[in-house]
Amino acid sequence: MSHSRYYFTSESVSEGHPDKVADQISDAVLDEFIKQDPNSRVACETFVTTGQVIVGGEVTSKGIVDVQTIARKTITEIGYTKGEYMFDANSCGILSALHSQSPDINRGVDRKEEIADEFDRVGAGDQGMMFGYACTETPELMPAAIQYAQELVRLLAEIRKEGKIMTYLRPDAKSQVTLEYDGNDNVLRVEAVVVSTQHDPEPAGMSEAEFQAVIKNDVIENVIKKVIPAKLIDENTKFHINPTGRFEIGGPHGDTGLTGRKIIVDTYGGAAPHGGGAFSGKDPSKVDRSAAYAARHVAKNIVAAGLADKCTVQVSYAIGVARPISIYINTHGTSKHGLSDEQIQEKAEAIFDLRPLAIIRRFNLDRPHGWCYRDTAAYGHFGREQFPWEKTEKVAELKAALGL
């Protein structure tokens, strides 16, 4: 293995970023449909811009959802509640353009024949490939750069909502973390942290430069140093806080937001492959979402069981077909106990049922308890213990199957 050092970078965005506003509205609409009718089929897309929200997509459900009320509630909770933001929950226009799903798709998902057991009853909602990943870089078994990037913007939002310090904060923000690794893929240190946060105008009597200096110090002391372990920060670590200076205009007024445009933020920060399908606004019959959750579950249990230090899982489907077309597991040369990837994959395939209905039942994706889909729509779908696909309950079964 090479011993040359290298850098790796991941980014995240806050719940107030326009693309994340769109994701959260889409998932809040999905939550309401699922709550009223667990068998709802939903593909909900949201567009947000200055003073306007458009919600569209395809739905088959017995539920009746007030899209306007849900969108305004979501925007309020994110924090867009002032007219000066040019995107205000109370005054923005909201257009709903949801319509019924194609019966051709529904026919493929709800199968009526070729059934060996009940889990063969539901075919995949579309073709495609999905990836899951886990590694030992953090306690959450997530890549470190994305984990830190998510925690930075999450803490920034908590501080903003608490309103005790940094009272100038506005909802939009981004983070980026660059780590230095040794040739054995161990994190050595933080090379750079970038945080851009929207803020109020500078107070009277304070120049832009003075205000930005205050913001920089506050972000370093109250956010970065609370999230990133002190041992990883040294005198050469670079902090770029609002590097362009003033950041007053932001959110959907600064940039148009769309559902599904932050798929790398949602997953592993570029540390693992991505099948290309977004998550938010999609009911669990859509394998873009449910199978990506299941693939993470498989990868995390393999790493948690001590079978490998890294694990990538790929699963693929054909529309209307329940059983995966292919499953692929790669431990990147980090497998333990003399195990081959083939041995690990053989046991994993026997233990983890990756048919869509089996995934839905295993995680109660049609009846979420203790979480909701909107919870997933900001700060990452993985590495957060509240979600059932993060459980490592299969560790003992995996180890026993492999004679460990």
Curated annotation (Swiss-Prot):
Molecular function (Gene Ontology), one example: magnesium ion binding
Residues the entry annotates as binding L-methionine: E58, Q101, D255, K286
Subcellular location field: Cytoplasm
Catalyzed reaction equations: L-methionine + ATP + H2O = S-adenosyl-L-methionine + phosphate + diphosphate
Keyword Magnesium applies: yes
GO CC field: cytoplasm
Region named Flexible loop: 101-111
Binding residues for ATP: H17, D172, A173, K174, R246, F247, D255, R261, K262, A278, K282
Positions of Mg(2+) binding: D19
Annotated keywords: ATP-binding, Cytoplasm, Magnesium, Metal-binding, Nucleotide-binding, One-carbon metabolism, Potassium, Transferase
Cofactor (UniProt): Mg(2+); K(+)
Residues that coordinate or bind K(+): E45
Pathway assigned to this chain's UniProt record: Amino-acid biosynthesis; S-adenosyl-L-methionine biosynthesis; S-adenosyl-L-methionine from L-methionine: step 1/1
GO biological process: one-carbon metabolic process; S-adenosylmethionine biosynthetic process
Superkingdom assignment: Bacteria
The EC number(s) this enzyme carries: 2.5.1.6
Enzyme class: transferase
Record note on cofactor: Binds 2 divalent ions per subunit. Binds 1 potassium ion per subunit.
Pfam families reported for this sequence: S-AdoMet_synt_C, S-AdoMet_synt_M, S-AdoMet_synt_N
Family membership noted in the UniProt record: Belongs to the AdoMet synthase family.
Function recorded in the entry: Catalyzes the formation of S-adenosylmethionine (AdoMet) from methionine and ATP. The overall synthetic reaction is composed of two sequential steps, AdoMet formation and the subsequent tripolyphosphate hydrolysis which occurs prior to release of AdoMet from the enzyme.
Subunit structure: Homotetramer; dimer of dimers.
Protein name as catalogued: S-adenosylmethionine synthase
